[in-house]
Amino acid sequence: MAALTDFAFMYRWFKNCNLVKNLSEKYVFITGCDSGFGNLLAKQLVDRGMKVLAACLTEEGAQKLLQDTSHQLQTFLLDVTKSENVKEAAQWVRDQVGEQGLWALVNNAGVGLPSGPNEWLTIKDFVKVININLVGLIDVTLNMLPMIKKARGRVVNMSSSGGRVAIFGGGYCVSKFGVEAFSDSIRRELHFFGVKVSIIEPGNYKTSILGQEALESRMKKLWDRLPQETRDSYGEEYFQTYTKKLVNLMRSAEPRISDVTNSMEHAIVSRSPRIRYNPGLDVKFLYLTLAKLPTPVTDFILSRYLPRPADSV
C-alpha cells in the first residue's frame, strides 16, 4: 500500500513538473481580466514570460492591468455578450498570433447575480447571467477555435462547484452546468486535433462576482418587487433567513484566490493538464460528495439548509 501511495505521489509530481517547452513564445487570451481570477492569472503568466492577451470589460480595468504588468501583456475591451465585439476580438487576436496560432484560451468572464429563489426571479434575470457565463463563453470559443487548433493548444473554461450541484437558484448554476456540458463535448471533438480542454471548478472564493453589499441590496430588491401573494407564501422570516445564509456564505469565502489561478496556470503550462480542477476544500469534501450521492439524499441534505416558507406543507 505504501509503495502504491509513493508511486501515485511521484506520478502526480511528474505530471505537475512536466511543462510545455518554449512558453515565452506562446500566446494566451484571457477574458474577464478587470479583477479577480482573470486579473491575477494574467499577472502570473506575464511573470512566466508568456505573451498575454487580456480582455477587459472596462477601460479603467485595462489601464490598471497595463500599469501593473510589462510590455508582454496587451489588452482589448470585450463584452462577451456582444457577438460583433467577439468577432473583433478574434480578429485582433489573429493579428497578434499570426501563423503560430493561439496556445490557450481562458474563458474566465462571468457574473453571479441575480441569484436567489427561482420564483423570485424573472426570465431577464436568468438570461442576463446565462448570456455572460455560457452563451458568451461559447461565442468566444467558437471564434477562437481555428487559431487554437493551429497551435494544438488548450481551452480552459471557468465553471464552478455550482456546475456540479445546484446549491442556489437563478441563472448561475444553470449556466455552469451548461459550461460543463459544452466543455465535455468539445473536449471529445477536439481531441483529434491535439487540443486539450480543462474545466476549473472552484469552491467559495472571495471575488467581486458576489460582493456582500451587492448581494444584500439585490436580495432586498428581489423581495420588494414580488407580488404580495408570493411574499405571503414565503414570509418575511424566510426572506431574512435566506439573505442571512447567503451573506454568511460570502463571509466564509476563501480569500486566497491564487489556489484557483494556480490551477488555471497548470492547465496552460503543463504537458498533461487535468480535465477537471477542484480548488478549495469545500469542493473536495462537500460539493463533489453531494454531486455523487443519490439525488434524493442530496435533496434531503440541501433542503435542510433552506429556511421553511410560511405556507409550507
Swiss-Prot record:
Provide the residue positions that the database annotates as binding NADP(+): 29-53
Describe the family membership recorded for this protein in Swiss-Prot or TrEMBL: Belongs to the short-chain dehydrogenases/reductases (SDR) family.
**Catalytic-site annotation from UniProt:** Y172 (proton acceptor)
Q: Name one GO molecular function term.
A: all-trans-retinol dehydrogenase (NAD+) activity
Which GO cellular component terms, listed alphabetically, does the Swiss-Prot or TrEMBL entry include? cytoplasm
Phosphoserine found at: S185
Entry keyword set: Cytoplasm, NADP, Oxidoreductase, Phosphoprotein
Query: Which reactions does this protein catalyse?
Result: a N-[omega-(9R,10R)-epoxy-(13R)-hydroxy-(11E)-octadecenoyloxy]acyl-beta-D-glucosyl-(1<->1)-sphing-4E-enine + NAD(+) = a N-[omega-(9R,10R)-epoxy-13-oxo-(11E)-octadecenoyloxy]acyl-beta-D-glucosyl-(1<->1)-sphing-4E-enine + NADH + H(+); a N-[omega-(9R,10R)-epoxy-(13R)-hydroxy-(11E)-octadecenoyloxy]-acylsphing-4E-enine + NAD(+) = a N-[omega-(9R,10R)-epoxy-13-oxo-(11E)-octadecenoyloxy]-acylsphing-4E-enine + NADH + H(+)
- Annotated gene: Sdr9c7
List each coiled-coil range.
none
- What name does the UniProt record give this protein? Short-chain dehydrogenase/reductase family 9C member 7
E.C. number: 1.1.1.-
Query: Which tissues and organs express this gene's product?
Result: Highly expressed in liver.
Under PROSITE patterns, the record lists: ADH_SHORT
Which SUPFAM superfamilies does the record associate with it? NAD(P)-binding Rossmann-fold domains
Annotated compartments:
Cytoplasm
Q: According to its UniProt record, where is this protein mainly located?
A: cytoplasm
Q: What does this protein do?
A: Plays a crucial role in the formation of the epidermal permeability barrier. Catalyzes the NAD+-dependent dehydrogenation of the linoleate 9,10-trans-epoxy-11E-13-alcohol esterified in omega-O-acylceramides (such as in N-[omega-(9R,10R)-epoxy-(13R)-hydroxy-(11E)-octadecenoyloxy]-acylsphing-4E-enine) to the corresponding 13-ketone, the reactive moiety required for binding of epidermal ceramides to proteins. Displays weak conversion of all-trans-retinal to all-trans-retinol in the presence of NADH. Has apparently no steroid dehydrogenase activity.
Query: What CDD domains does this protein's entry cite?
Result: type2_17beta_HSD-like_SDR_c
